[in-house]
């Protein structure tokens, strides 16, 4: 499951806890996906197939349309009182138009700012203008907009959202799934782990580029990636150069398995490419790692770095190969020296108290329901 899937499941559960009947309209998972969870009481899931890229992602205009067009017809003939849409803004626009035709309220869950995302990828000016127009229209029309941080809220208001309609509900992780309690992987040697999406704006290949310097100090160390994304080709190329399976791409794994790898790691790796419009981001993988007790190495600046630094979740460093490799070496040194149990417990306790996804989901559901009453 992606961070977005966890977030939406928490929202759906929040609605169920408030006595709502919830229907989730989503995609049929790709064949490579791990088995999904069974349906829960009060929550019905409807799936239909979509076009995907070679990596199994719903990524690109044609792929989005393969979801959005059938969605429009499903919403036109479905019985509902309220719709909640998540990004991309193309999906938000479909929900906005159908809801207007049917005179139903809708909410928009803005975990990311897509206009900034397409700018960071170097998209043509026309694409940026179209994305900005769609995102702004959706934000203006939504009865409620859910934001994950104050920084995202400010950016949403700049794009046209009414501040009094934006609820900053925070972000978090499933602390039942991601916790220090449970089995931990043993790789026979120290390893560092990156879990989740490897997009252009995360720059996950930076850690692979740092591995040669790490191996000079710790020749038996290994770097493991779990997930998928645009950085995979660059990571595979670096893995081939390093050789000896020192850098391993493990694909998409179930969340429970990801938690096992995190628990056993010398450190969990998180990154945001600075200066491309995503410095406000606080990746969910930071919370997941800290919830398992693992120290976080965050490469980048802005809100994500402050989160790690201010709450003792690990180490925030510059987005450079030298800074990252030094931090990775320090993490392995600490792992070899043993101990650190108090720090692991403190990290997990902070997430439990401040970033439980159950609490986020309930707060989000309450904000949406309050907006339509």
Task: Give residue spans per PLM region.
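Nucleotide-sugar-dependent
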Residues: 202, 254-261, 268-290, 297-307
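Conserved donor-binding/catalytic core segment of Leloir-type glycosyltransferases
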Residues: 184-212, 224
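N-terminal subdomain of nucleotide-sugar transferases
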Residues: 1-46, 214, 358, 373
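Nucleotide-activated donor-binding/catalytic signature segment of Leloir-type glycosyltransferases, i.e.
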Residues: 189, 233-260
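Membrane-proximal helix-turn-helix segments that form the acceptor-binding/catalytic region
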Residues: 13, 72-73, 79, 93, ...
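Nucleotide-sugar donor phosphate/pyrophosphate-binding loop at the beta->alpha transition
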Residues: 63-66, 104-107, 115-138, 175
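A charged, aromatic-enriched C-terminal amphipathic alpha-helix characteristic of glycosyltransferases
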Residues: 319-323, 336-368
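Carbohydrate-associated surface elements
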Residues: 28, 151, 172
